[in-house]
Amino acid sequence: MKINNSLLNFVNGMLVTLPSSKTLTLSWNFGSMLGMVLIFQILTGTFLAFYYTPDSLMAFSTVQYIMYEVNFGWVFRIFHFNGASLFFIFLYLHIFKGLFFMSYRLKKVWMSGLTIYLLVMMEAFMGYVLVWAQMSFWAAVVITSLLSVIPIWGPTIVTWIWSGFGVTGATLKFFFVLHFLLPWAILVIVLGHLIFLHSTGSTSSLYCHGDYDKVCFSPEYLGKDAYNIVIWLLFIVLSLIYPFNLGDAEMFIEADPMMSPVHIVPEWYFLFAYAILRAIPNKVLGVIALLMSIVTFYFFALVNNYTSCLTKLNKFLVFMFIISSTILSWLGQCTVEDPFTILSPLFSFIYFGLAYLMLFIFMSSKLLFK
Amino acid sequence: MQRAVVQGSKRGLAALAGVTAASGMGLVYALENSVSASGDNVHPYALPWAHSGPFSSFDIASVRRGYEVYKQVCAACHSMKFLHYRHFVDTIMTEEEAKAEAADALINDVDDKGASIQRPGMLTDKLPNPYPNKKAAAAANNGAAPPDLSLMALARHGGDDYVFSLLTGYLEAPAGVKVDDGKAYNPYFPGGIISMPQQLFDEGIEYKDGTPATMSQQAKDVSAFMHWAAEPFHDTRKKWALKIAALIPFVAVVLIYGKRHIWSFTKSQKFLFKTVKGREPPKAQ
């Protein structure tokens, strides 16, 4: 049946009658799961914001106020804290799935996805700082100082973000406002990401020329996406049983500008980038490598190659990439001593080598079929 | 012949992959052990706490005794600024007991004329801080301010095990280790030299419930109390986890059935290739 309203037709064409391949497995659920977690994080975060004060003398105390005094405040904080980890788990699975199925062929989807990834990293970092614990404060000092490598404007930008000459309560206010506003921007970009995706439909492992042998997105894939609820319930159970396992003990020590922790390590989802940053003993080059570890994947969207997939070779390279990323993450939490100071640059090199090898193959494989 | 060669090379490749993976795992295991071995302190032994399991609750009797240890030993130097006496009500004490505990404490306050006074505490008061500020605390303790104990159980790597080991781990300093006056040697503390001398001794206090107050008993009880203080919601969250975990199988069954119901037509599709009259394949000439 046809509806006269063009907006309804637009939505209908994307969510109900979208032709979808029959072969989309549970790997395609990662995207909808991320949407669920994002909404969940926005809700829990909004409730936490009711009771939080971004003042350097009070921030840590208000976090504990939420834990001790606010009715069920501890639940919201546990969910918000672990929800960030859940988001990154599915984000990385989503990215790897994208690499396996060469989803960078959908250029707009890929570009918007990478942008979302960068924004979510910023969001997670700023949330990390708001706790105003020892690791928060010193992570803020280290990461914001990296911006000083920007030519000409670097020191000015750092001073602006600090709102002073060091990380202070004013910095906390700065981060709190951004931490609250950024998710809404991410939400808009996610909707754009979704629209780009559903304009073309997902890539799949089965090539199908035309739409004659496909199913409607609804109700088939809505039913499949409902499986996410089971994962979500599992997440709730694990959060309640192991609320702080993914955090550091330093998370419970109030920030002290006079004393830094023995080791400063970021959350688990930043460890690979941290390892790459530390692998290069030059500040500027380290920051550039840190950025390129993500920006490299933008280059995939510059290649026009829709059909030439070397599936087995690509699968092998993606597995190698996953292994090297995992090892880099492990290296990121090791102390700076032998043999880790040798392994970090080695695996950073492997990481970039594999990424550019995938890019090269993607560019070249088209020529094989000319 | 060709197939045999392919199979042989595949088997060889699989064997090579297996050996490589095993080597990788071995390397990671060795390096991880070296990471654990790094650091300048002894790692605490894993202890069987009553509340360690995924669905285990606190031993409230132990927590109560731990509060007695805190009040009679730790409170002389350490504050618990996030804890109020009302948190004890109907959790580890009755309301009357909590009120009595509060009344025992001397709370710094200001009277109607603005003069500083000390008054008996009430339920809404925090556990008192023995020092007016951090600098006073440091000055009274050889320059090392005793940290607040509210979150201590979560604020140290090793958690309860570390606290217990630290409190029972004092020993004579090895030859060559210089220990200043007012400090002590404890291998569990980072660096080995700790500003808090040994505080727990056999029969150092007397428990109300008659439990023998050995040093290890006191250490266990005060560790449990400190964990309870850091996580008052501990028992509630595990109860909720158990309830939701019990719910998951039913939700899963409903969702799986629903999805399979939706897909039944698609999954049971059959393709039939038949000749349509008038579109027969051409006859061989």
From Swiss-Prot, chain A:
Source organism (scientific name): Caenorhabditis elegans
Annotated PROSITE patterns: CYTB_CTER, CYTB_NTER
SUPFAM superfamilies given in the database record: a domain/subunit of cytochrome bc1 complex (Ubiquinol-cytochrome c reductase), Transmembrane di-heme cytochromes
Other comment: Heme 1 (or BL or b562) is low-potential and absorbs at about 562 nm, and heme 2 (or BH or b566) is high-potential and absorbs at about 566 nm.
Keyword Transmembrane helix assigned: yes
Record's cofactor remark: Binds 2 heme b groups non-covalently.
Quaternary assembly: The main subunits of complex b-c1 are: cytochrome b, cytochrome c1 and the Rieske protein.
Bilayer-crossing regions: 30-50, 74-96, 109-129, 175-195, 221-240, 284-304, 316-336, 342-362
Keywords: Electron transport, Heme, Iron, Membrane, Metal-binding, Mitochondrion, Mitochondrion inner membrane, Respiratory chain, Transmembrane, Transmembrane helix, Transport, Ubiquinone
Keyword Chloroplast on entry: no
Similarity comment: Belongs to the cytochrome b family.
GO CC, any one term: membrane
Residues holding heme b b562: 80, 179
Protein name: Cytochrome b
